[in-house]
Amino acid sequence: FWLLNVLFPPHTTPKAELSNHTRPVILVPGCLGNPDVVNWMCYRFTIWLDLNMFLPLGVDVPGFGKTYSVEYLDNSKAAPYDWRLEPSQQEEYYLKISLGAPWGGSDLHFEEGWYDLLAGLPAPGVEVYCLYGVGLPTPRXYIFDXGFPYXDPVQQQPVHLLPLPGTQHLNMVFSXQTLEXINAILLG
């Protein structure tokens, strides 16, 4: 973006004359439920628009996952340990070890340690739709018994499980099956 500022400094950007017939331009950027990173549109506008109003929008979608690229937040590019630095420069690495990430407790032979965090977790209390992909091989298989983590939470509102055959997890948002299922849910 700095190159655009050099080539097209803000004071040389042509602006449209405002009149009563000029309709306002309202941009609403969203980041798929990621509240941690500001959308790039929040601090850089396009050079060919004279914006009258700008509304950055962050929609929090719990459980959707993080949508940012690790290059923006992590100088080590998501590598847990950078061998080029001395250990005293990587205190975060040792903190991650103490919290169990990124190995999930397998280095301590305590993979089930997170079960205690889910004990007594209340049901959400709203009608729930769960869309998930099936029918593709995965590197690991998780088999949950009827007592996961201790007992299934019970709620009065229905919980709908909608399998999507042949849909990969990360491609689910681009799948036509997913959009059809969402339309059926929203439109009835």
UniProtKB/Swiss-Prot annotation:
Pfam family, one: LCAT
Tissue: Detected in blood plasma (at protein level).
Positions annotated as glycosylated: 20
GO biological process, any: phosphatidylcholine metabolic process
Domain of life per record: Eukaryota
Hydrolase keyword on record: yes
Enzyme Commission designation: 2.3.1.43, 3.1.1.47
Catalytic activity: a sterol + a 1,2-diacyl-sn-glycero-3-phosphocholine = a sterol ester + a 1-acyl-sn-glycero-3-phosphocholine; a 1-O-alkyl-2-acetyl-sn-glycero-3-phosphocholine + H2O = a 1-O-alkyl-sn-glycero-3-phosphocholine + acetate + H(+); a 1-hexadecanoyl-2-acyl-sn-glycero-3-phosphocholine + (24S)-hydroxycholesterol = (24S)-24-hydroxycholesterol ester + 1-hexadecanoyl-sn-glycero-3-phosphocholine; (24S)-hydroxycholesterol + 1-hexadecanoyl-2-(9Z,12Z-octadecadienoyl)-sn-glycero-3-phosphocholine = (24S)-hydroxycholesterol 3-linoleoate + 1-hexadecanoyl-sn-glycero-3-phosphocholine
Active site: 169
Gene Ontology MF, one: 1-alkyl-2-acetylglycerophosphocholine esterase activity
Keywords: Acyltransferase, Cholesterol metabolism, Glycoprotein, Hydrolase, Lipid metabolism, Secreted, Steroid metabolism, Sterol metabolism, Transferase
Location relative to the cell: Secreted
Entry GO terms, CC: extracellular space
Record family assignment: Belongs to the AB hydrolase superfamily. Lipase family.
General function of this protein: Central enzyme in the extracellular metabolism of plasma lipoproteins. Synthesized mainly in the liver and secreted into plasma where it converts cholesterol and phosphatidylcholines (lecithins) to cholesteryl esters and lysophosphatidylcholines on the surface of high and low density lipoproteins (HDLs and LDLs). The cholesterol ester is then transported back to the liver. Also produced in the brain by primary astrocytes, and esterifies free cholesterol on nascent APOE-containing lipoproteins secreted from glia and influences cerebral spinal fluid (CSF) APOE- and APOA1 levels.
Protein name per the record: Phosphatidylcholine-sterol acyltransferase
